[in-house]
């Protein structure tokens, strides 16, 4: 939800709260106590010698688009100016930059000649004064700005366009969305300076005809909290007065017409989004706010067709969508120059629903941002009445009596209780109850009780204040953070201890680095294909709705694909002998990715490629292989005192089918190890590479609770070798399992030292030789004891794997 920029007119603010401070001082005070001020801008800065001109005559220059104008700029004689604007004509008041004037980009106006005609200045558009195209009224977007008729020739133009106003740019965090309105900012400034607010009231005169005779409203979704409407008849749609256009442009909003501009004014003033419909374009007189149906669509005011889902909210008439609730109106019912009857809408929609819709459609608006963060329940209907009164005033409309409404909102203050001791302990202050009373009086909050226990009545306009800690924050802000004493904490220190998860991560990291692996950190976001490429059990993908690129669009469900990207990056830079590891998170999603957050699981992974030993005068070069990868894991498991099984698998499509094994711990798959499939390696542009990945949570759950110290025995061990003839398909793991199943307690080590297949061995068979070590920690072993052990082991091998002892 991030921060939202609110552009505050200093002139307008002073009308709402009586302050006598400079804009710079106000900005500093606000930043220190409540809301960060990004900056202050004066649109007139850098502009000079811009005056009102009255076009006395305007003649077309033959065979050109130019016009030769005589302009009264308050001098003794008219000023001749050549102008190319299509909307220049005699009788209008315009902006004139006289010779020596400075306009946007510090451009200086000089006397000149155009097509041989002398031009003593320039008739300006708003763009030439530095205003953005996005906020300039469309009727002036391709031409010059026309000033109000009452503008006096020769006067500086700044006061007529409010370019001399100071625009304070506030950065509003989600918890202070109450300041996304002029009334909210006024309350805040009044609290800071101990002033009172003064909000002008409108005199609403209603006709005898009731709104309920013209319109009916209903709610058919739990995500619509309330919906209310008024009807204004006999409206005259025209441009808004200049003061209203100036106010909107200074707030970053383009003026449209008096009806639409009134709704935007109310948005800025109350923080309450509104919409105006053309009543005569309705096919029915009943408005229903409901969830959209799959397959429905709506052409919004920007001319774009929007395909809707059941997660969207729509305003419907005759069961057809006419607006995307809380985001943007529909083109079919928009206000135009011929509109006569206007339906005004106010509502409160669920912020989460609006956020999903605007995010899915990448359609952010002033309305959607306010619904996402919250609106003041107490002024919803007041805003509706205020807008109707403004239309009565600016559009000569007749307001039907009353309003129609579906759904009710709580408007009474929210009560929060605490004590003076609670406040002082947390702030380190010695405030009195009188101090608390003064602060909450400045905030406009009600207060009852005494220092032992008091209750604060928080107005609905401050929906961010709901618990005692919020009250402490409000007290600290108004009291002054700079006045809070510096105190040391009184609580005694607590000895720190690693959690089991932290301890395991630290141990695994130490073991990995001791084995020669280098830690990397790869991106958690990858492509949808790579996200599941090496996942043993892929789940639903969690994807970004609007990714910067497809390369970083989905949360990973395995670590290996990211490691291979790192391997490829290094190999491309001539670094081919690599041993890398990473401890990070993968993201499994068993539910709906659009509704629920994924599960975050800690995994360990490594990748090795190239040589483990370089060729020198004594040794040959030695390349990595499956057994190097497995050896890393064996060392890891031995240090963790865990016993695992390796089971060959062909189920991982991106791994070599003959050199890959699943890793089982207590019969549960916790990871895999093996060679990356040659085809996959080619796709990544990497050499033969071996990888492994483990579930750290599974390792942690299986760790023995106690590590028992075993005394080093002083009695010697005895070793016996055994050579076995077996079927070629019998694995080393199966042999080890068979040997261990014999139950020989004195067996301490099993080592494979030879594997042979050749002409002396019959087809389909192989020879494997093992060295078995026996040791009694309390006594010397005898040959007879070891012989009995070997007999039991031989029997187990014969029965379980069909081994023939050679």
From Swiss-Prot:
Among SUPFAM superfamilies, the record links this protein to:
Anticodon-binding domain of PheRS, Class II aaRS and biotin synthetases, Nucleic acid-binding proteins, PheT/TilS domain, Putative DNA-binding domain
Record field: catalytic activity: tRNA(Phe) + L-phenylalanine + ATP = L-phenylalanyl-tRNA(Phe) + AMP + diphosphate + H(+)
GO cellular component, as recorded: phenylalanine-tRNA ligase complex
Task: Print the keywords alphabetically.
Answer: Aminoacyl-tRNA synthetase, ATP-binding, Cytoplasm, Ligase, Magnesium, Metal-binding, Nucleotide-binding, Protein biosynthesis, RNA-binding, tRNA-binding
The UniProt annotation places Mg(2+) binding at: 464, 470, 473-474
The subcellular location is: Cytoplasm
Q: Where are the transmembrane segments?
A: none
Q: Which cofactor does it need?
A: Mg(2+)
Tell me which residues make up the FDX-ACB domain. Answer: 713-806
Q: Note how many cofactor molecules are bound and how.
A: Binds 2 magnesium ions per tetramer.
Q: Which domain of life is it from?
A: Bacteria
Q: Which residues form the tRNA-binding domain?
A: 44-158
Query: EC number(s)?
Result: 6.1.1.20
Tell whether Repeat is among the UniProt keywords: no
Q: Which residues form the B5 domain?
A: 411-486
Q: Which Pfam families match?
A: B3_4, B5, FDX-ACB, tRNA_bind, tRNA_synthFbeta
* Primary residence: cytoplasm
PANTHER family the record matches: PHENYLALANINE--TRNA LIGASE BETA SUBUNIT, PHENYLALANYL-TRNA SYNTHETASE BETA CHAIN AND LEUCINE-RICH REPEAT-CONTAINING PROTEIN 47
* Known partners and oligomeric status: Tetramer of two alpha and two beta subunits.
Q: Which family does it belong to?
A: Belongs to the phenylalanyl-tRNA synthetase beta subunit family. Type 1 subfamily.
HAMAP family in alphabetical order: Phe_tRNA_synth_beta1
What is the protein name given in its UniProt record? Phenylalanine--tRNA ligase beta subunit
Q: Which organism is it from?
A: Streptococcus pyogenes serotype M28 (strain MGAS6180)
